């Protein structure tokens, strides 16, 4: 027979077990542990919080200039990005976009694409909340024929419906989609608009002619405050994103348990103000260290023109790259670097982005201090299956640079307009002032200050992927 003391001991053990497994508030944690966990949380969560900024501006905040439309509605623009577009850093002006968000919690969705001209590059990029590019549809993967594709969340189980070409499975129920449709020139905008109008999205129930399932209640999306990604509010947004994730991804359970000790987790109960002052201060330090870690990784790899091909991709690709190329235990830093330099960039097989942060002498690019050139020797233009471009970005805003030509890039679709050198070489002029002695067709206007350049190779050939071909350096003009 148990004594009262024994019963109380058993009860205490049970209560302790339940608290350890199901507690929603922060557990006892030292400032040192809080600092380390906050640093880890920042590197892990930065891409998701930056993604939330885009989600909120595009889908939730109807008063935002960047607002696109509600969930599960294809939204396209037959235009190119300008300096007024500020929601996505390092934007692309080569291919008019359709950009929209899916909510798969109720049921899967079917996305259909039209037949495309054989020489036109296009693709549909599908990105989960982690910012993994989990699937593609398009020229390089499924071809230019018409097709329909079933997009499903992590909990869906079923068979491939008739009329659907493939199932594309996301780790998360919330998905971002970007379609890119090649523009051959200003006169081609009408045709691009026609193609965009043929992109179609249907709930699975409508596609098969069945009854629609109940719609789950909408999450309580917190208002986005610009700058939150760089201060204490970051942790609240990460907490919310974990409610959308619901469960940890592969290998993430230990991190989620550590975050739970700070009160950050899928129940959405995080309250930074309720934490002890010394823990708040430790988390501030950890957050700053996390951002410094991202910046340090970028700086350490600034001389690698092909780094973009290593930081965008599937979960599996990033894990392999982190281990093989950088000897890292996980790929969180790769996702964060990608989000910081250019959210929603493409996987290497679709496009790579050789990036210029410094000139051939190792000095940061600065339009107020120098004029520059990039010269492609004869036969050394970027090797691509589709096309290539070179785009200018302001070094402070990471956006396009206003200029009198409204020119933000040079690309291979205008090769006939370039002035070639006698031996067949191509020299591009990178400077803030209009050139005096050279054709303006080769001029890419720079800001009166720091800048960086991104070369985009769509459908890169093997020589570009394995380093056999390397981008020429940016040379200071003599």
Please identify what each model-predicted range represents.
Residues 2-10:
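Bacterial N-terminal signal peptides that target proteins for export
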Residues 17-20:
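C-terminal motif of bacterial Sec signal peptides marking the signal peptidase cleavage site
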Residues 24-478:
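A compositional/structural signature for long, glycine/proline-rich flexible linkers
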Residues 1-2, 69:
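Intrinsic disorder/low-complexity signature
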């Amino acid at each position: 027979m148990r004594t009262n003391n024994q019963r109380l001991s058993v009860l205490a053990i049970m209560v302790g077990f339940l608290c350890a497994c199901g507690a929603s508030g922060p557990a006892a944690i030292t400032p040192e542990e809080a600092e380390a966990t906050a640093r880890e949380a920042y590197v892990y969560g930065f891409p998701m919080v930056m993604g939330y900024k885009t989600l909120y501006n595009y889908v939730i905040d109807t008063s935002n200039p960047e607002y696109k439309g509600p969930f599960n509605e294809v939204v396209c623009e037959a235009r190119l990005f300008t300096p007024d577009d500020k929601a996505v850093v390092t934007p692309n002006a080569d291919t008019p976009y359709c950009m929209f968000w899916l909510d798969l919690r109720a049921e899967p969705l079917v996305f259909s694409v039209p037949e495309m001209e054989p020489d036109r590059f296009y693709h549909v990029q599908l990105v989960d909340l982690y910012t993994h590019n989990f699937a593609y549809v398009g020229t390089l993967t499924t071809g230019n024929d018409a097709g329909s594709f079933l997009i499903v969340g992590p909990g869906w189980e079923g068979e491939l419906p008739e009329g659907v070409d493939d199932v594309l499975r996301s780790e998360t129920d919330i998905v971002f989609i970007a379609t890119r449709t090649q523009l051959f020139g200003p006169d081609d905008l009408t045709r691009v608009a026609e193609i965009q109008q043929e992109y179609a999205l249907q709930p699975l129930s409508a596609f098969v002619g069945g009854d629609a399932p109940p719609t789950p209640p909408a999450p309580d999306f917190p208002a986005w405050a610009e700058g939150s990604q760089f201060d204490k509010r970051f942790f609240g947004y990460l907490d919310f994103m974990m409610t959308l994730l619901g469960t940890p991804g592969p290998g993430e359970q230990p991190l989620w348990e550590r975050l739970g000790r700070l009160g950050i987790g899928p129940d959405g109960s995080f309250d930074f103000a309720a934490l002890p002052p010394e823990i708040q201060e430790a988390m501030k330090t950890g957050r700053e260290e996390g951002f410094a870690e991202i910046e340090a990784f970028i700086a350490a790899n600034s001389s690698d023109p092909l780094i973009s091909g290593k930081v965008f991709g599937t979960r599996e690709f990033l894990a392999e790259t982190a281990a093989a190329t950088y000897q890292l235990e996980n790929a969180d830093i790769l996702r964060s670097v990608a989000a910081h330099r250019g959210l929603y960039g493409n996987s290497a097989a679709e496009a790579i982005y050789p990036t210029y942060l410094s000139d051939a002498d190792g000095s940061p690019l600065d339009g107020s201090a120098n004029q520059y050139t990039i010269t492609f020797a004869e036969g050394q233009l970027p090797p691509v299956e589709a096309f290539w471009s070179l785009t200018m970005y302001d070094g402070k805003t990471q956006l396009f640079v206003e200029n009198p030509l409204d020119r933000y890039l040079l690309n291979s679709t205008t090769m006939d307009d370039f002035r070639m050198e006698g031996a067949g070489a191509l020299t591009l002029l990178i400077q803030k002032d209009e050139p005096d002695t050279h054709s303006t067709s080769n001029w890419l206007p720079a800001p009166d200050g720091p800048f960086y350049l991104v070369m985009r190779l769509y459908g890169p050939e093997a020589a570009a992927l394995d380093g056999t071909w390397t981008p020429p350096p940016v040379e200071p003009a003599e």
